[in-house]
A protein has these predicted regions:
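Selective transmembrane helix interface/packing segments
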Residues: 1-340
């Protein structure tokens, strides 16, 4: 892989005659730069034990082990990930070729569809932690029982993982660059360093999304702790130990992405859209309403079981009506299609 990367640097940078030259040159950077910008708000370490806020003191200076900690850090990450859509879309449009154009159309539809599920799945995280700051979210996950994957009931994590995989165009959702259908997808006409930038952006996005999953759902740089027992790394200061824990957790999700690539077949395009719009978005909305009702009932002193039962009943009825609407719409389309 390293040899292939070096080889690409010395290849000729070809630009198609029918392309929009300025946009064609700009598109790789619109994909490459956002892949690194999202890492700015991820805590890469720090001391979050015993209620600490992640600050560490190195060489007489007290600081966080992250580039920036805005109060809306998670929204920043979601906004930056949306910019990468433009890089892929413009790359296909500016190439002046049909296959890249089809790949970019697929990319825009797929990524916009799954961005909705991605953002909605985080609503329960904000509801449980009470903050949009990444350092605040990490600080709220002091033990395994407080990890958001447990506190939110696993479902938001599963939705986020599926939506993130689709957002990254990773298998089994890699319809943007399906070789059997689109030759190489949106980057078919690219070569040399610009081609390498797209692949570097894809791999870096996988690392960034894995780090974001760990930060939001698995305690980030927090060590593994259960019922007061902390799994320490001997002879390592707390500030550096957090970095080691973050790196180890990220490696687990990188392994999961490689495992998914090797085991699952590619989805059909209609299956991809149905999963996003008919399953993930309703599920994330329904789960958010359920968690919100439970927390409201707890604050008001209501019976949690009764509140949960009523919420599940209402959500189940709503989902049944939604499925009925889908079936009626499908029958109408079939009837209209049979007229021609």
């Amino acid at each position: 892989t390293l040899a292939d990367g070096i080889k690409l640097f010395f290849k000729e940078d070809l630009i198609p005659d029918r392309s929009d030259r300025f946009v064609f040159k700009l598109a790789p950077f619109l994909s490459f730069v956002p892949a690194f910008l999202s890492f700015a708000i991820i805590p890469l370490g720090g001391d979050f034990r015993d209620g600490n806020n992640g600050m560490v003191t190195w060489f007489g200076h007290t600081t966080r082990v992250q580039l920036a900690d805005p109060p809306v850090g998670v929204l920043f990450a979601l906004a930056i990930s949306a910019i990468a859509v433009y890089g892929i879309m413009l790359a296909g449009w500016s190439s002046g070729s049909k296959y890249p154009l089809l790949g970019s159309v697929r990319a825009s539809a797929q990524m916009v569809s799954y961005e909705a599920a991605l953002g909605l799945s985080l609503g329960t995280v904000f509801l449980v932690t009470g903050t949009l700051s990444t350092s605040g979210i990490v600080a709220a996950q002091s033990s395994i029982g407080n990890w958001n994957v447990v506190a939110t009931g696993v479902v938001p994590f599963v939705i986020f993982l599926i939506a993130a995989t689709a957002e990254l165009n990773r298998p089994p959702f890699d319809l943007v660059e399906a070789e059997q259908e689109l030759v190489g997808g949106f980057n078919t006409e690219y070569s040399s360093i610009r081609f390498a930038l797209f692949y570097l952006a894809e791999f870096m996005n996988t690392v960034t999304m894995s780090a974001l999953i760990v930060t939001l759902f698995f305690g980030g740089p927090q060590p593994i702790s259960f019922r007061g027992t902390v799994l320490d790394i001997p002879f390592v200061p707390n500030g550096i130990e957090g970095t080691i824990w973050l790196f180890a957790k990220v490696l687990v999700f990188l392994y999961i992405y490689v495992w998914l690539r090797a085991t699952l077949p590619r989805f059909r395009y209609d299956q991809l859209m149905d999963l996003g719009w008919k399953v993930l978005i309703p599920a994330s909305l329904g789960w958010f309403m359920l968690i919100a009702a439970q927390r409201l009932g707890r604050d008001q002193g209501w019976n949690t079981l009764v509140v949960s039962a009523v919420s599940v009943t209402v959500l189940g009825a709503s989902y049944a009506l939604l499925q009925a609407a889908f079936k009626v719409s499908a029958k109408q389309r079939e009837a209209e299609g049979s007229m021609f």
